[in-house]
Amino acid sequence: MTGTLVVDASFVMVLLTSSSEATTTWANDVIHETDLVAPHLMPVEVTSALRNAERRELVTPEQAALTHEDLVDLDVELHPFEPFASRVWALRHAMSPYDAWYVALAERLDAPLATIDRRLARTADTRCEFTLPPE
C-alpha cells in the first residue's frame, strides 16, 4: 500500500503490541510505504488502552511503558477536531464521536481507515474505505 492511511487506536494498539502474530504482521504490512494520519485524539485513546491493559495485567508495567514510548515516537500526522466537527456531528446516530472523527478524517482525505473494528466498517453511513485484518 502506498499513500495516506488513517489509523485508529485499535490499529495502533495492534501495531505496537504483540497481539497475534498474524495480526501484527498484517499491521506492519499495511503501513509499509504509507503516511500515517490520525485525529489528535488517537494517542490519548492508545494511552488509555495501554493503561487498561496494564491494570488488567495483560502487559507488564515495563511493557506498557515501552509501548507508550513507541507510541510517542510513532510518525503519525495528527489532525485537529474543528475541521471535522460538522461531519462528526452528522454521524452521531451511527457511531461514537470518537469513531466518527476517524471516519470524517478518512473521508476528507479520501484515504482508507485501518482498524480492527469490523462493526465500525459495517456502518452504513460511512463514505470511506476500510482496511481490516484477515479473519
Spans of model-derived segments:
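Acidic catalytic patch
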Residues: H40-P43, Q63-H93
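Short, well-structured N-terminal submotif of metal-dependent ribonuclease cores
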Residues: M1-L41, A53-E62
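Acidic active-site catalytic centers that drive phospho-/nucleotidyl reactions
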Residues: D8, D99, D117
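Alpha-helix capping/helix-boundary segments
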Residues: F11-V12, M42, F84, Y102, ...
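Acidic, PIN/NYN-like endoribonuclease modules and their adjacent C-terminal/linker elements
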Residues: M1-T4, P39, L91, V103-E135
